[in-house]
Regions:
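Conserved, mostly hydrophobic/aromatic
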Residues: 55, 96, 137, 162, ...
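Glycan-recognition patch characteristic of GH18 chitinases/ENGases
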Residues: 19-127, 152-153, 161, 371-396
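Short, acidic/polar
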Residues: 35-49, 113-128, 188-199, 243, ...
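Cleavable N-terminal signal peptides of Sec/SRP-targeted secreted and luminal proteins
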Residues: 3-22
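Cysteine-rich, disulfide-bonded extracellular modules and peptides in secreted proteins
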Residues: 389, 397-517
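Glycan-binding loop/region signatures in secreted carbohydrate-active enzymes
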Residues: 28, 98, 215-236, 264-346, ...
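Active-site groove signature of glycoside hydrolases
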Residues: 123-150, 213
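Substrate-binding surface in catalytic domains of secreted glycosidases
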Residues: 65-76, 142-307
Length: 517
């Protein structure tokens, strides 16, 4: 009888813990974020391993023999630290993005069965070699006027062949099937010209719809980067340039809603105004100034926005449910906590499969804007009710969740930190579940998730006085490193068993240490 009761309690716990975990939160990391200066620098180990359900590393390229190749000199090193995040969160899935901003190689790759077979075999070997769980195919415009019209059907054929090959490989090796996903455009013109929507969805695990970059400095008028809805204030051609139309268009043409992941940008786009008119649709002379860290005109990361917003005029585009700000000749369209909340409610109402962030490295890692660490991504985590990164053993097992009927009395349903144990938390869901974070993680009350401990001040506070912003190895302890931010000194420990390498500015396994010092 006791065993039966224990099993019933265990099943209840599992069912309670699964509440709110049906949505995906997919976070892209770009391999050029490592080159940004100061607070803009972002490495794989900066990613809280339990904030997102899936992480995507961008990008790998296709060479002239139709095989995958790395893009950056240290990609192979970064792959290790990226995939090592799964050791802190066994539920996490990692994927590799293929393609990107210059996907010309796709043209010849899809052109023949032989080329497609070479590509497919290369993908399988590459993904298995580096320890990813899947890949994300990014081809923004297969229907471009520069491309042959056959590419529309060839993309579907490639998807069909990929699905078959991945199923066969999994069956032969006994390994979990490699996840096959893609990121496709939100433009009606590109969808019509390049995609057999009613066919291609059946072959992929999910599709990220890039619901951003609807407007930017390429326009001669101001417009929001990622509006939720259309507005009568915009030009007629812009009626299609919003999240709601794009997502419904994919769905209404045959893509299942549950396979559709909606894009949320962590950046804004700027314009230089032509006149004193600063309204939506006002004449624009070009891009706004470059960001201090991202360095590209017309484009600011979220952590670059706050200085501008301090004394800017902020207005809400009521029909589109998104804010914009103006100061002098600069017009900025961006997203904030409120617009994310509105968009997530719309996402839930339409029963889409989840959200993806482009990109986590453009979010505010260092709480520069005083809203917490990675505030936009954390907001999505909370709104989608994702609780990743927990130890979910059977009740009664070592390090597993325990039941304490009294702790949640008079508390609302939700997740609470354990005031007596930083690595534990309570899940109040009709019953009380007392859980552990994965090893080396602590519970963060802000994101309601398990994450890395906060950076600690170093006792030698003058260590960074003469040093530029960046990461530095502790010469006396290989598993520690310093972080210099505006001449302030912080230090952190690498995860257990790892050491810090100057070459990649990352924590990694102590292999070939002398080569990377």
């Amino acid at each position: 009888m006791g065993r039966v009761f224990g099993l019933i309690v265990g099943l209840i716990l599992l069912s309670q813990l699964q509440l709110g975990t049906n949505y995906k939160l997919i976070c892209y990391f770009t391999n050029w974020a490592q080159y940004r200066p100061g607070i803009g620098k972002f490495m794989p180990e900066n990613i809280p391993p339990c904030l997102c359900t899936h992480l995507i590393y961008a990008f790998a390229m296709i060479d002239n023999t139709h095989k995958l190749m790395t893009k950056e000199w240290n990609d192979e090193i970064l792959y290790i630290s990226f995939n090592d995040l799964k050791k802190q969160n066994p539920n996490l899935k990692t994927l590799l993005a293929i393609g990107g901003f210059n996907p010309k190689r796709f043209l010849s790759t899809v052109a023949s069965k032989k080329n497609r077979a070479t590509f497919i075999n290369s993908v399988v070997k590459f993904i298995r070699k580096y320890g990813f769980d899947g890949f994300n195919l990014i081809w923004d415009d297969p229907g471009s006027k520069r491309n042959p019209p056959e590419d529309k059907s060839r993309l579907t054929i490639l998807a069909k062949e990929l699905k078959k090959a991945l199923h066969t490989e999994s069956k032969q090796t006994g390994k979990p099937k490699i996840l096959f996903t893609a990121a496709f455009p939100a433009s009606k013109y590109k969808i019509d010209a390049g995609f057999e929507v009613n066919k291609i969805g059946q072959y992929l695990d999910f599709i990220n719809v890039m619901t951003y970059d609807f407007h930017g400095a390429w326009n001669s008028f101001t417009g929001h980067n990622s509006p939720l809805y259309n507005t009568t204030a915009e030009h007629r051609v812009s009626a299609y340039f919003n999240m709601d139309f794009a997502a419904r268009y994919w769905r209404d043409n045959g893509l299942p809603a549950e396979k559709m992941i909606i894009g949320f940008p962590t950046y804004g786009r700027t314009f230089t105004l032509k006149s004193s008119n600063h309204s939506l649709g006002a004449p624009a002379a070009g891009p706004g100034p470059a960001g201090s860290y991202t360095k590209g005109p017309g484009y600011w990361a979220y952590y670059e926005l706050c200085e501008f917003l301090k004394d800017a005029k902020i207005e809400l585009i009521k029909e589109q449910k998104v804010p914009y700000a103006t100061k002098g000749k600069v017009w900025l369209g961006y997203d904030d906590m409120n617009s994310f909340e509105t968009k997530v409610q719309w996402l839930k109402n339409n029963k889409f499969g989840g959200a993806f962030v482009w990109t986590i490295d453009l979010d505010d890692l260092n709480s520069h804007c005083k809203q917490g660490v990675l505030p936009l991504t954390t907001k999505l985590n909370n709104l989608l009710e994702i609780n990743a990164g927990k130890i979910s053993n059977v009740v009664g097992a070592s390090k597993g969740p325990g039941v304490d009927q009294g702790w949640c009395t008079n508390k609302k349903l939700g997740i609470y930190s354990d005031p007596e144990a930083p690595s534990r938390f309570y899940h109040c869901a009709k019953i009380t579940i007392h859980e552990y974070c994965a090893e080396n993680l602590v519970f963060d009350e802000h994101c309601k998730c398990c994450t890395w401990p906060e950076m600690k001040w170093h006792q030698e506070s003058k260590w960074c006085i003469s040093k530029p912003n960046g990461f530095y190895r502790d010469r006396n302890n290989a598993s520690k490193f310093f972080i210099c931010v505006r001449h302030q000194t912080f230090w952190r420990d690498c995860p257990k068993g790892l050491v810090f390498y100057d070459a990649c500015k990352c924590c990694n396994w102590p292999i070939n240490l002398t080569a990377l010092k």
